[in-house]
Amino acid sequence: MAALRALLLLLAVGAQAAIRFAKEPYSQDALHGRSAILRCEVEEPAHVEFEWLQNGLPIQDTEQRFKEGSNLQFAAVDRHRDAGSFQCVARNVQTGEEARTANASFNIKWMETGSVVLKQPASAAEIQPSSTVVLRCHIDGHPRPTWQWFRDGAPLPDGRGTYSVSSKERTLTLRGAGPDDNGLYYCSARPRAVGSVCSQDNFTLNIIDESFPQAVVVPEDLIVTKNEEAMFDCQFAAVPPPTQEWLFEDSPITNRSKTTVFANGSLLITQVKARSTGVYKCIGHGQKGKALVLKATLRLAEIEEMAPFSPKVLTANQGHRVSCACPRGVPTPQVWWERNQERVPTAGRVYQEAEQLVFTSITEADAGIYTCHAANKAGEKKQELSITVATVPKWVEMPKDSQLEESKPGYLHCLSKASLKPTVTWYRNGVSISEDSRFEISENGTLRINNVEVYDGTMYKCVSSTPAGSIEGYARVHVLEKLKFTPPPQPLQCMEFNKEVTVSCSATGREKPTIQWTKTDGSSLPSHVSHRAGILSFHKVSRSDSGNYTCIASNSPQGEIRATVQLVVAVYVTFKLEPEPTTVYQGHTAMFQCQAEGDPVPHIQWKGKDKILDPSKLLPRIQIMPNGSLVIYDVTTEDSGKYTCIAGNSCNIKHREAFLYVVDKPAAEEDEGPSSHTPYKMIQTIGLSVGAAVAYIIIVLGLMFYCKKRRKAKRLKKHPEGEEPEMECLNGGTLLQNGQTTAEIQEEVALTNLGSSSGASKRHSARDKMHFPRSNLQTITTLGRGEFGEVFLAKAKGAEDAEGEALVLVKSLQTRDEQLQLDFRREAEMFGKLNHVNVVRLLGLCREAEPHYMVLEYVDLGDLKQFLRISKSKDESLKPQPLSTKHKVSLCTQVALGMEHLSNGRFVHRDLAARNCLVSAQRQVKVSALSLSKDVYNSEYYHFRQAWIPLRWMPPEAVLEDEFSTKSDVWSFGVLMWEVFTQGEMPYAPLADDEVLAGLKSGKTKLPQPEGCPSRLTKLMQRCWAPSPKDRPSFSELAAALGDSPADSKA
C-alpha cells in the first residue's frame, strides 16, 4: 500500500512538472540577408533552460545567428547555413525533464546573379555565318524568376522568327545567325519577391562576312605636345576592297596644309593646336553590311602644379610612409623621390614604393629635405618636403626633492634634451600647473614658485615630451616654514568693562614656538590677568587694564617675533529707548525715539528704507534730534517703510528696526478737529486688520501642514524608501528634483479618473480625439514582449489622418498590475503631449475592449540596435552604406534633440538605449519606448528588487537609491553614444550583471573608449558619466556640443 502511495506521489509530481509550450516556432517565409526570429516560450519558465537544434544538432551563437532569451534571433538569414529544420528544446534543470517543439523551417527567398555563356556551338571560334547560336542565362533564384534578353542595351522584342526564347532552359536560340545579329547579349531576371538583377559577364557575338568591312589596323589614341605632329594609322579589308574616309567632329577631312590622308588610309596632322584635339573617326564602307567606324582621340599633353607639402615630424626608430600625390596630367605623370639630387632607390632601409617614400626604421640621419618629382610629355613638376626626426627626451637634470623657504621664490629644475625641443609640463598633486602670478615655467623647463606658501609642500611631477615619447620625474617639496603669527593679532581690540575677556595670540614656525605676553612698557601683568598657551585672560576687566600689550613668539632656530596690541576698555552699547512701529495719518507728524548708552558715548545714526540718512542732506521736514530721535513732519505714503536706528561707539555697534505705516485719514473724522488725530476707531480698524491677517496666516499654515503630512503618509505608503515624487516618468513612477514635489496635484488629476466633472469632461473629449478603431488594425508580426504585454507591428487604416494604410507599432496592456496599468496610461499621456521630429508620436488609443492598445508611429528600419549590428556585419550582402563618424554623430545628435524636447516637457525616460530608438532608411532617429524586456532584449535587463531594470544603462543613484531625473537620462545617453560608436556592442560585455552592480557601487566600472571615436566625443561621454548628477551636462548642452563637433576629427 505504501509503495502504491509513493508511486502516486511521484506521478503527481511528474504531472505538475510537465513542461508546456506557450509559443512554438513555426515555418515561415524569409528573405536571404534579412532579419528573422523563431520564438519559443513555456508557460512556467522557472528553472527552465532553452536550447535550439538545427537538423538535430545544437546551434552555436554567432554574430548572424544567436539566442536572445529563449528565442532564436537571425540578424541575417543565409539560404545555405539556415536551410533545414529548427527545433526548440526546453529543459528543467531541477527535474531534468525535457520537451521539444515541432520542427520549423524557413522558405528562404533568394536571387543569385550569373553570366551569359555560349551553349552551342562549343566555342566562339566555331560560329559560322547562317549557323545556329544558343546562349544560356545563368541567373537563378527562389521562387523561380522570369527572364528577358537584351542586345546592345535594347530588349529583344517578342514574336521575331529569327530567334526563340526558352524559359525552362533559360536559353536564347538565334537561327541562321549572321553579321546583323552581332552585338552584346545579356539577360535580366525579375523574381516575384526579391527585386530584379542583371547578368554580370555577358557575351559578344561577332560573326564575320568577307563582304563586310573588317578592321586590319585600328587607330590608337594619341597624346602629343603643342605644335608636334600626330599620325593616325587605319586600314580595312573586304571582298571587294572597301572604301575609306576620315571625319573630325563629324566633318570629312581632306588633304590640306595641316592634314594629309595617305593612300594606305593613314592620317597625318601637323602642328597640333588645342583646336585640333578631339575625336577622329576612320570609316570603312564595304559592298554589304554596315559601315565600320573606328574612333581615336587626339589630346594635348599637360601637367598641373603639385600641392605643397607641410613639414613632417617623424618618430625615431619607427616605420613611416610619406605619400606624394600625383598631379593631374595627360598622360599620367610618373612620380619619383630624390634626396641630395639622387633618386631614392626601390629597395633598402629607405626606399620608394609606387608614389610613397618608405622608412623601415627612421634615424636622426634621415632628417633633411626630400623632393618629390612628377613628369610626363608636358614637362616636370617638383615639391620639397622637410622631414624632422623626433627622438625621446633624455635627462640633463632631473627634478629633485627640495627644501624651499616660505615667502621666498623657489625653483624646481627639469632639464632635458632631444632632437626637437621638448615640451615641459608640470603637475602638482596630479593636476597640471598653469602659469599665473605664483607659478612660472621657463623655456628650459624650470618651475619657479614666486612666493612659496606652506601648502606648496607636496609632490610635483615634470613631464618632458616630444612627438617620439616622453619621460617624467618626481620631486617632493618640503616648505621651511617661517616664524609668523597665525593670524597676526588685531592691533586695536576692545574689552567690555567688568566682564571676563580673553585675547588670543598664536604662531607657527619650523619648530613649535613659545608664546608669551608682556606689557609694552615693561611693567608686570596685573594679578587678575594670566596667560597660558598664547591666551591672555582678564578675569574681570577694569579701567586700568587699558594699554599696550606685546605678544612674543620664539623658537631656537628662528629667534623671536613681536606683535603689539592696544587694548581699550569700554562699556558696550545698549539701548535705553528703542524705536517702535508707528502708524500715522497722511500729513501728520511721525516720531521714532532712540536712545543708547555706553562708554565711549554712542553715536546715533538713522537709516531709512535701506539708505543712510545724512543730516546735511535731509529734506526740511525730516530731522534727527540731538537726543537721537527721528522726526518726520507732514508724512506721505512714500515715507512708509522700515527705519533703522544705529548706535555705535569705538568698540561695538547695535541697531534696532521699526516700521512706519502711513494711512489715509477717514473723511468723517476730518471735520472733528485737531483733537481726533489719534482716534480710537483707527486703532480698532488696524487691530481688526492685523487680527484678520494673523488668522489667515494661521489657517494657511495649518492647511499646509495638514497637506504635507497627508502627502508624506501617501508617499511613504507608495514609496517605502521615502523618496518624494516629482516629474512624470516615461516608464512609470514619479521623481525627485531638488527635494521638492512638482505639479503633484495637477499630474495626479491628469493621469487618473479623479477630479471635477468639468475636468473629467475635458479629459474625455481629449481621449475621444485619440480614439482609434481596433477594427482598423491588421497585425503583421510580433516584435516581442515587455512589462505591459505584447508589442507588435500592424497596418493601420486612416492613421495620421491619411486615407491609405500606414505601418504602426502597437503596445498592448495585458497585465492586471495596477502600478503597470498606471504606467501604461502615463506613457500614453506623455507621447500624446510630445511633438518633435525625433520623438515617436502617439497616433491613437484602443480602449473599447481589453487588452487596451497604444498605437505609436513606426519607421521602416526598426530599432537602432539592430541597425547598428547589421552595419557592423562582415557579410557585404547585408551591410548598408558604411557608418562614418559623421553618420554616427548625426544619430547621436538626433537622439539628444529628441531627449531635449522630452526633458523640456518635464518627462523622464528611464530606459534610454539604442534598442528603444527607431531609425528610418533616411537615417532619421526617433526616441521611442519598445522596452522588449521579456524576450528579444531580455539579456539587457537585470532582475533587481522585484523589478526588471536596464542595469548597464543606469547611473548609481538610479540603481541604488531609485532616484531618477533628467540627469539619470543623460547618463543613459552617454551609454547610447558608446553603443553607436561600437556599433551595437553590449556595455561591460566581459562582466556579469553582479560584477556590473558591484562596479556601480564602488564607482570603478568604466566603459572603454570606442575604437576610432574622436577624443572630443569620448570626453563628452565621460561628462555624461560624472558621479554627481549636477556635474552632468543638460540635453541642450549635449545637442549643441554634438552639433558643433567636427565629424572627422581624429581620435
Curated annotation (Swiss-Prot):
Cytoplasmic side of membrane: 707-1051
Membrane topology, from the record: Single-pass type I membrane protein
Residue ranges annotated for the Protein kinase domain, each copy included: 777-1048
Domain of life: Eukaryota
Ranges for domain Ig-like C2-type: 23-105, 115-204, 213-298, 308-388, 393-472, 487-566, 573-661
Disulfide bond is among the record's keywords: yes
Single GO BP term: regulation of canonical Wnt signaling pathway
GO CC entries: axon; cell-cell junction; neuronal cell body; plasma membrane
Major localization class: membrane
Topological domain ranges for the Extracellular compartment: 23-685
Locations listed in the record: Membrane
Pfam families named in the record: I-set, Ig_3, PK_Tyr_Ser-Thr
Chain ranges passing through the membrane: 686-706
Record bears the keyword Aminoacyl-tRNA synthetase: no
Chain positions carrying an annotated carbohydrate: 103, 202, 255, 264, 444, 548, 627
Molecular function terms, GO-annotated: ATP binding; axon guidance receptor activity; protein tyrosine kinase activity
Keywords: Cell adhesion, Disulfide bond, Glycoprotein, Immunoglobulin domain, Membrane, Receptor, Repeat, Signal, Transmembrane, Transmembrane helix, Wnt signaling pathway
Signal peptide positions on this chain: 1-22
Disulfide bonds: 40-88, 137-187, 234-282, 326-372, 414-462, 505-551, 594-645
SMART domains linked: IG, IGc2, TyrKc
InterPro entries in the record: Cell_Adh-Cytoskel_Orgn, Ig-like_dom, Ig-like_dom_sf, Ig-like_fold, Ig_I-set, Ig_sub, Ig_sub2, Kinase-like_dom_sf
Homology family: Belongs to the protein kinase superfamily. Tyr protein kinase family. Insulin receptor subfamily.
Domain notes: The protein kinase domain is predicted to be catalytically inactive.
Protein name: Inactive tyrosine-protein kinase 7
